[in-house]
Amino acid sequence: MNIAAKPPLTIRLCGPRGFCAGVDRAIQIVVLALKSYGAPVYVRHEIVHNRYVVEGLEAKGAVFVEELDEIPAEHRAQPVVFSAHGVPKSVPEDAASRNLFYLDATCPLVSKVHKQAMRHNRLGRHVVLIGHAGHPEVIGTMGQLPEGSVSLIETIEDADAYAPADPDNLGYVTQTTLSVDDTAGVIARLQQRFPNLTAPAADSICYATTNRQEVVKQAAPGCDLFIIVGAPNSSNSKRLVEVALRAGAKKSILVQRAAELDWDEIGAISTLGLSAGASAPEVIVNEIIEAFRARFDARVELAETVQETENFLVNRELRSIELTAADMAFVNG
């Protein structure tokens, strides 16, 4: 097919998109640990929720486990990395009891939520955590506090049904990757029911989640299709699909790789929105664009709201190790 025969397509490419500072830092920690200590480096849980990233790190020598007892005795001297989502307090305690050397890749913004929750608890408040049951970040945050001192609220319906023992002594925090609008609704309902509910000192939803949702909102109206690059277990990616639909996209889908695209289902479109969750690498965004260019006379327009400059330092033990562009080429291209 020659270019003249290809139907025209405008791709609204969202910015910011893809990796946030916390994800970048977590991946860098694994890469630098491999350079410093050699393979294998063990990682408890997926370092970030993206199979492409996980498989790329496995190819470099990382070994992913769900529990510390999966690490063979002969490799106990090798480092184990905790994922960006954070872990309960019991996990580093377990690592110490096994004489494991661990590197914590918890996102600093997740650690901030841990501190907010602990402050509520220290001041005698029962903690209300707004988040999704079973998500590793929620498990990690709940695991910072004594059992029974945290209540999980997922929806407005949960907020309506919530019956705390002491309704005048509550403090809330949220998962960092939630829908900004949905969370605002849940908080408003809780505040309506419990006027003395104490907010955290700073917003728990992270800058990257907010920024990616905001630009998708702006780009979605008029889009025949909105593609979010991300994994099905990525909370922030799934929220972007919902945001695109609510903001006016006719259809929105979550895609991990270009090979997943169903061209018969996509059909005839003239405007495509494209963004990526905070754990999705730029190489996959480029892969998606090239797949559309092969079938359409595609023109890319940048839809940008803000430029992100945040950068989080890696663990002190790794800061003397040089990180090169080649080290990160598997995700950055």
From Swiss-Prot:
UniProt: (2E)-4-hydroxy-3-methylbut-2-enyl diphosphate binding residues: H49, H85, H135, T176, S234, S235, N236, S279
Cofactor note text: Binds 1 [4Fe-4S] cluster per subunit.
Superkingdom in the source lineage: Bacteria
Cofactor: [4Fe-4S] cluster
GO biological process entries: dimethylallyl diphosphate biosynthetic process; isopentenyl diphosphate biosynthetic process, methylerythritol 4-phosphate pathway; terpenoid biosynthetic process
Pathway: Isoprenoid biosynthesis; dimethylallyl diphosphate biosynthesis; dimethylallyl diphosphate from (2E)-4-hydroxy-3-methylbutenyl diphosphate: step 1/1; Isoprenoid biosynthesis; isopentenyl diphosphate biosynthesis via DXP pathway; isopentenyl diphosphate from 1-deoxy-D-xylulose 5-phosphate: step 6/6
Binding-site positions, [4Fe-4S] cluster: C20, C107, C206
Binding-site residues, isopentenyl diphosphate: H49, H85, H135, S234, S235, N236, S279
GO molecular function terms noted in the UniProt entry: 4 iron, 4 sulfur cluster binding; 4-hydroxy-3-methylbut-2-enyl diphosphate reductase activity; metal ion binding
Entry annotation: catalytic residues: E137
Alphabetic keyword roster: 4Fe-4S, Iron, Iron-sulfur, Isoprene biosynthesis, Metal-binding, Oxidoreductase
Record family assignment: Belongs to the IspH family.
Record-given protein name: 4-hydroxy-3-methylbut-2-enyl diphosphate reductase
Organism expressing this protein natively: Rhizobium etli (strain CIAT 652)
